[in-house]
Curated annotation (Swiss-Prot):
Ranges of the Cytoplasmic topological domain: 1-46, 118-119, 176-180, 242-277, 342-343, 400-407, 459-485
Membrane topology: Multi-pass membrane protein
Pfam family, one: MFS_1
UniProt source species: Danio rerio
Record field: catalytic activity: choline(out) = choline(in); ethanolamine(in) = ethanolamine(out); heme b(in) = heme b(out)
Keyword Endoplasmic reticulum: yes
The name this protein goes by in its record: Choline/ethanolamine transporter flvcr2b
Keyword Lipoprotein included in the entry's annotation: no
Ranges annotated as spanning the membrane: 47-71, 90-117, 120-139, 147-175, 181-206, 212-241, 278-308, 313-341, 344-366, 370-399, 408-433, 436-458
GO biological process: transport across blood-brain barrier
A GO molecular-function descriptor: ethanolamine transmembrane transporter activity
Subcellular location: Cell membrane; Mitochondrion membrane; Endoplasmic reticulum membrane
Amino acid sequence: MDTRFNDINRVKMGDESKSVDGEVNDNTYYSKTDAEVNFEHRYTTPETRLYKKRWVIVCLFSSYSLCNSYQWIQYGIINNIFMRFYGVDSFTIDWMSMIYMLTYIPLIFPVSWLLDKKGLRVIALVAAALNCAGTWIKVASARPDLFPVTFLGQFTCSVAQVFILGMPSRIASVWFGSDEVSTACSIGVFGNQLGIAIGFLVPPILVPNVDDLDELAAHIRVMFYITAGVATFLFVLVVIVFQERPEIPPTLAQAAARRISPESYSYTASILRLLRNKAFILLVITYGLNVGCFYAVSTLLNRMIIEHYPGEEVNAGRIGLTIVVAGMVGSLICGIWLDRSKTYKQTTLAVYLMSLMGLVIYAFTLDLHHLWVVFITAGALGFFMTGYLPLGFEFAVELTYPESEGTSSGLLNCSAQVFGIIFTICQGKIMDSFGTLAGNLFLCAFLLIGTIITGCIKSDLRRQLANQQAQTADHLDTSPTQTRF
């Protein structure tokens, strides 16, 4: 075989090799998704194919992700109403949101291991089943003396979330072409964001702030029944429709990943390799800072708005809706832009900086007593802060290829949950003592730190390198001047 062919067509991400920018990669073990694109012992490129069903899969995932994320914020956005109904304090209702964050931290590692061992379908089934179970537990909790039951339902849904958050990048890699992965990941994140948006909008409408507790219980029960019906329908769809992977892989990198024996994969070794990846660790920190700020703002939004605009529970929900809808637009635009430009670091840094500017403007305009100004500044904040989510996922996959997408996404989300809990508790205490401006400036300081760290991340796009070298190999393999023996 032509020696040029051997040299060019070997993408050994497991060896100590040079990355795009010359940095030495010290990955010395193979992982389950190790794409060693080695064409030494065959003369034809593996077949790749894109199936129309890929859009069904990502949209179905997006739908049950929506149903789960909606429940994350459904208590917090009408914080004052649930406080009165269940007879608990504000901090206790804040924990209905923070339980989503806390549950994620210890469970992400076993769930990531399960994803690598059992695949997408098993994870999807467990997520949809737990989400469905949690909604029906809540149906039974619509009485003032049953707060522990409603907390149990929320806890069950929070466990389901662990099986959801790390999936977008994995679904994108397994089902979509190399020019579609960022867009597909954005669609996966889109569902989560849309669920949060609906969680901001619908509860204040379905559960008005009425004085009669029996009437209030009836409104809460209707909200819980609607959620349970949707969750049950989606669970049935997942059972019937959701498929593990396409029969023929969508990319050469994915085809190479399938040739790696499962027995050669070590989850512990994969985690250790990721922890030695300096660029990825910096991204984990910056992602946690940004998304943690978003979690804190979302959880405490009702308190911020009610402090300056008493009686505006419905508009507090609409402002939250504005934040997330603007973010969904930002996510899709960023995903499409990444697929076309491949400028992962530059785009991530620009969006991070704009998130910081958006939060500063929001902080200083919140108390102007003009709600229309808050809607505009909140929309600008959401466009960039929520739009950052898929950027972090896709940048992580590039930096950590060929490691499992579920593992890298899981570590990002784990960081976000840790910072989310810390920021929510700290900002809440600062707001109680010094007001909303001080609380928001507290978050701005950490976004500034995150922006600086993002600028220090080295752009080592390993997945792009693997696909480029595989395509080069294909070109040489089909060249009429190629000599075969």
